[in-house]
């Protein structure tokens, strides 16, 4: 039995509340169990210098955790004067995952920045940020279409992500912190709406695992992402 009482193939309770902030072109509060992430999408009619004049847009991401999003307070990275390697890795992952789901040429010469702020962390913050990031991005693009700034929809696919792992020898879906901290193996899967893979991050923490173990995690992730896709569709309908 999992610490949460869930079955091995069961997601945590998932909710997506859109329009959570007033000013951003797209926003949502996404919750997987006790993990809660506020995601906003902000439109800027400018591009990084290396992209100017190339006839395409850009989607980038920033990620951060509130000081008391975890069991004990952590100093803000701004107070430390630099971002951690973990933060940089996660925000790059979010950005490239979301770029896989959009035609940057159809976006035009503008940038959409996805800001992911972890309000409460209980495992799976990066995957929640990606899944919520797509919702915020979709909402921002909808505004561009409604205003006539875009005449063609640049979104080519939904994007969602979920964690899986091997806990006490059993492959499980959507690890919370209690499971993640003791898992023999863990993985993050990012998928397109048709279940094609965008990214896989997998590592053995306690013991190596074989190819069949990885495939079992992949099958769980595909099942979980299908449920997330359904919730995303409801949120942006």
Swiss-Prot record:
Coiled coil segments of this chain: none
InterPro entries (UniProt xref): ExoRNase_PH_dom1 (IPR001247), ExoRNase_PH_dom2 (IPR015847), ExoRNase_PH_dom2_sf (IPR036345), PNPase/RNase_PH_dom_sf (IPR027408), Ribosomal_Su5_D2-typ_SF (IPR020568), RNase_PH (IPR050080), RNase_PH_bac-type (IPR002381), RNase_PH_CS (IPR018336)
CDD domains per UniProt: RNase_PH_bact (cd11362)
Biological-process GO terms, alphabetical: rRNA catabolic process; rRNA processing; tRNA processing
Pfam families: RNase_PH, RNase_PH_C
Root EC class: transferase
GO MF term list: 3'-5'-RNA exonuclease activity; tRNA binding; tRNA nucleotidyltransferase activity
Reactions accelerated catalytically: tRNA(n+1) + phosphate = tRNA(n) + a ribonucleoside 5'-diphosphate
Alphabetical UniProt keywords: Nucleotidyltransferase, RNA-binding, rRNA processing, Transferase, tRNA processing, tRNA-binding
EC number: 2.7.7.56
Role played: Phosphorolytic 3'-5' exoribonuclease that plays an important role in tRNA 3'-end maturation. Removes nucleotide residues following the 3'-CCA terminus of tRNAs; can also add nucleotides to the ends of RNA molecules by using nucleoside diphosphates as substrates, but this may not be physiologically important. Probably plays a role in initiation of 16S rRNA degradation (leading to ribosome degradation) during starvation.
Family affiliation: Belongs to the RNase PH family.
PANTHER family the record matches: EXOSOME COMPLEX COMPONENT (PTHR11953), EXOSOME COMPLEX COMPONENT RRP41 (PTHR11953:SF0)
The name this protein goes by in its record: Ribonuclease PH
Native species: Zymomonas mobilis subsp. mobilis (strain ATCC 31821 / ZM4 / CP4)
Classification lineage: Bacteria, Pseudomonadati, Pseudomonadota, Alphaproteobacteria, Sphingomonadales
């Amino acid at each position: 039995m999992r610490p949460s009482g869930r079955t091995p193939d069961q997601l945590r309770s998932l909710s997506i509340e859109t329009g959570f902030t007033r000013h951003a072109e797209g926003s949502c509060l996404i919750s997987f169990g006790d993990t809660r992430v506020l995601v906003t999408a902000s439109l800027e009619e400018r591009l990084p210098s290396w992209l100017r004049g190339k006839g395409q847009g850009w989607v980038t991401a920033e990620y951060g955790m509130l000081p008391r999003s975890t069991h004990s307070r952590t100093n803000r990275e701004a107070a430390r004067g630099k971002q951690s390697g973990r933060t940089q890795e996660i925000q790059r992952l979010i950005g490239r995952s979301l770029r896989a789901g959009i035609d940057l040429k159809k976006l035009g010469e503008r940038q959409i920045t996805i800001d992911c702020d972890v309000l409460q962390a209980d495992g799976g913050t990066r995957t929640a940020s990606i899944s919520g990031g797509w919702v915020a991005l979709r909402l921002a693009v909808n505004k561009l279409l409604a205003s006539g700034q875009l005449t063609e929809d640049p979104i080519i696919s939904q994007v969602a992500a979920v964690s899986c792992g091997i806990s006490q020898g059993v492959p499980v879906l959507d690890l919370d912190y209690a499971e993640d901290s003791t898992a023999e193996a863990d993985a993050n899967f990012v998928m397109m709406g048709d279940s094609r893979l965008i990214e896989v991050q997998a590592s053995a923490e306690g013991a190596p695992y074989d190819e069949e173990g990885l495939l079992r995690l992949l099958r769980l992730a595909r099942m979980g992402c299908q449920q997330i896709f359904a919730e995303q569709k409801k949120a942006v309908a």
